[in-house]
Amino acid sequence: MISRIQELVAIVPAAGIGARMGAEIPKQYLMLNHQPILAHTLDRLLEHPRIDKVIIALSPEDSHFAKLSQASHPKLMTVIGGKERADSVLSALKVASQSAWALVHDAARPCLSAADIDKLIAACETEEGHQQGAILAMPVRDTMKRSGKGGAIQETVCRENLWHALTPQLFPVISLKQNLADALAAQVAITDEASAMEWAGGQPLLVSGRFDNIKVTHPEDLQLAALYLQAAASDPNSSTGE
């Protein structure tokens, strides 16, 4: 460990509607084990002792957030998000302390463990991680196929050195803000924070995360997330439980 992160702000882009879920309300407000998905996600972040503040980017039309019990938490503040994820993250970065590190986490990943947050922070307190930042990720386990026209298999892709990018992703506020702004100005497709850092020449570290840190995207994911949360709540050694 060469340099302890002194100030850490979590950023949650939550201005999207989650169209693939096909629900009548934004997916982050769907109920999961007696409270909305977003409430679980915020609990994971607000309860972590290393996180000083949580900034959540909301749609200007959001009528659900104020109903959450977490909405009045003293560590939490809100900003107006944008049309795309990167716009929402950038809005939050603009009000964050410029000397802090930003831990950006998906609103629809409610099963994040404190242990994974600890691992990610520890990676960024090493010499290489302090220079490059890091993301939670998971090695690809399944055989990968690339499709051609009509949905037929074009080729099998070697899965060696392939990873699924997860969140949180952790970078210094000042560099992430600059690189995101520059990439958006250049009309670069930014799918996560690491892609903005890569575009600027960075090589963020990959930190192996838990398989249960799933993103709720489709209806069946709700059932799986519920099982993971129930299992964590019944395990006294788990750092995900309520």
UniProtKB/Swiss-Prot annotation:
EC number: 2.7.7.60
Enzyme class: transferase
InterPro entries: IspD (IPR001228), IspD/TarI (IPR034683), IspD/TarI_cytidylyltransf_bact (IPR050088), Nucleotide-diphossugar_trans (IPR029044)
Keywords: Isoprene biosynthesis, Nucleotidyltransferase, Transferase
Gene3D superfamilies: Spore Coat Polysaccharide Biosynthesis Protein SpsA, Chain A
Record has Acetylation as a keyword: no
Sites marked Positions MEP for the nucleophilic attack: 159, 215
Reactions catalysed according to its record: 2-C-methyl-D-erythritol 4-phosphate + CTP + H(+) = 4-CDP-2-C-methyl-D-erythritol + diphosphate
Transmembrane parts of this sequence: none
A Pfam family recorded for this sequence: IspD
Function of the molecule: Catalyzes the formation of 4-diphosphocytidyl-2-C-methyl-D-erythritol from CTP and 2-C-methyl-D-erythritol 4-phosphate (MEP).
HAMAP family: IspD (MF_00108)
Name the UniProt record assigns to this protein: 2-C-methyl-D-erythritol 4-phosphate cytidylyltransferase
Organism this protein belongs to: Shewanella loihica (strain ATCC BAA-1088 / PV-4)
Chain's gene name: ispD
